Amino acid sequence: MILDTLGVGFLGTNTEVFHKANEYSKIYSSNVSSTVWGRPTLRLPPTYAAFVNGVAIHSMDFDDTWYPATHPSGAVLPVLMALSEALPPSPKFSGLDLLLAFNVGIEVQGRLMNFSKDANDIPKRFHPPSVVGTLGSAAAASKILGLSMTNCQKALAIAVSHAGAPMANAATQTKPLHMGNAARHGIEAVFLAMLGLQGNKQVLDTQTGFGAFYTNYSPKVLPNLDSYTWLLDQQDVAFKSFPAHLATHWVADAAASVRKHLVTDRTMCPIDHIERIVLRIPDVQYVNRPFPDSEHEARHSFQYVACVMLLDGGITVSSFHKHQINRPQVRELLCKVELEHPQDNLPNFNTLYCEISVTLKDGATFTERADTFYGHWRKPLSQKDLEAKFRANASGMLSCDAVERLIKIVDNLEGLEDCSVLTSLLKGPSPSEMISQSI
């Protein structure tokens, strides 16, 4: 999770939304500062370094997805990287310190979501990282800073008042801000708690507190540590092979199977012969975008992902560039797509499926179904493919040596004595190093 999150974060520093968030954050200054990933000459206060790095992670919707539904790592890892670097060098934070705080931040998100049946499904009202991510960020920061139980309770109460962003901003440049804000507000909540600011001690237990985000929120007393089972041990985490909403990955898998019936050898997909394309998918309105007009809309379009897979036989980062979205062949295929929502196909990442039927003008119909895609927790990416994804994502910002060192460090994080070894690599090469590398 950590390696994948770093990789998509590096890749995200090339996006327009990252540059806008970065420019905004430059107006803030502080004697205490942290690294903006891949930007060796830029440092920001830890709250804003966490903000822009969080935005980068979610800027392409390429980050991990957990079940119940949220993106767990993007709100937590930037916080821990920023704090471990900004705080005094003594005592040093070890890799084990980082891992423990990371696990706490993930666990808090999972526990809160498990108190609601609504959280199991693809969200309709609030974007989960803006809700549970903010609490996970505060919990992780509390852990790595060694807050007392009382101050940790205060921090979580404060964080609840920072939580929540509507799903209406999905498929826009504002959606990545949800992740950045979750990271930033978690740190701010902890800093305010350390100054003595108080909140409602029962905020996590009431319908007017955290329950305001879920219609059937029913918190329970957690078991003692002696009998405690970590949710993360279940490893219900999906890692994406292309940057788009997770539900579209079932569509891509099914479309790839149908394409094998349509394309032989190296011939092109016969779009002129296609009469109709039917996608049988869950009813998820914010991923129903018949004619996407931007990269963010395309990442949230069942229709677009199906058409690109049928046309190209694969989906990559560049598939969502503007000139790819506006290709005449894509627009022609989009006009032929219809959606159906079978009653048994619920909007749930653990149970949903995609069935696609392509009917040709001669009457022939080809149908394929995807129940699980490669990258889902039931069919996880191999370590080799995870590392390949990281290399592809990070190589545009880091040297080959730094990329390989990061892979080794993250793989042995529990044995790392000083996290500054890790954070120093996140900066990217300095201007002088870039010149020497090009010679």
Describe each PLM feature range.
Residues 1-2, 75, 97, 101, ...:
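Residue-level detector of well-ordered alpha-helical segments, enriched
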Residues 6, 76-86, 102-109, 134-142, ...:
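Buried hydrophobic packing segments
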Residues 48-100, 104-108, 112:
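Function-dense linear segments that define catalytic or interfacial modules
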Residues 1-70, 174-184, 191-439:
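Terminal-appendage/accessory-domain detector
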Residues 84-188, 202, 206-207:
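Glycine-rich, mobile lid/loop segments that gate access to catalytic sites or pores
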